[in-house]
Amino acid sequence: MAKEPTKAAHPQPEQTKTNHKAHRPVGGYVLAKDPIEINQGRPRTTLTVRNTGDRPIQIGSHFHFFEVNRYLEFDRSKAFGLRLDIPANTAVRFEPGDEKEVTLVPFAGKRFIFGFNNLVDGWSGDGPTPDYQPNREIAAERAEKLGFKSCKSGGKDAK
């Protein structure tokens, strides 16, 4: 049998007493006193969106709105290069037949968009298109060909 370790062989570190009080528990949050404004200074676009399908559709905060589910009907051309103006890791849900107004903001950074429904797979910025595909017109043609619903609407720029 092994011997029990003795306290002399394994001394405990000396505890020091302080008057220091923790400002927050370990792992606690540090919150700003002022409200946080997301996407500050970015231009906003408001669109009316309708779910024409028979199932609920949920769109996450950073999904390229131009490429959302084909059964959502809205002016897709106005949503090119934009995403929902909601906090990260949140979503907007459209029940069948629902019609809602959503506010969109441009993607930040270099505005390269890949994946989603593969309608864009490239640059989504404004201005002259770089030397590679796609551009807004090609993406719109691809969406129409694949049956993504769209309608011309009175989408507006929000302040």
UniProtKB/Swiss-Prot annotation:
Protein name, UniProt field: Urease subunit beta 2
Main location: cytoplasm
Catalytic activity: urea + 2 H2O + H(+) = hydrogencarbonate + 2 NH4(+)
HAMAP family: Urease_beta
Subunit structure: Heterotrimer of UreA (gamma), UreB (beta) and UreC (alpha) subunits. Three heterotrimers associate to form the active enzyme.
Function summary: Disrupting the ure2 operon has no effect on urease activity, or pathogen survival in BALB/c mice when inoculated by gavage, but confers slightly enhanced resistance to low pH killing in vitro.
Record-linked Pfam families: Urease_beta (PF00699)
One CC-aspect GO term: urease complex
Keywords from the UniProt entry: Cytoplasm, Hydrolase
Family listed: Belongs to the urease beta subunit family.
Biological process per Gene Ontology, one example term: urea catabolic process
GO molecular function: urease activity
Disordered: annotated segments: 1-24
Subcellular location: Cytoplasm
InterPro entries given in the database record: Urease_beta-like, Urease_betasu_sf, Urease_subunit
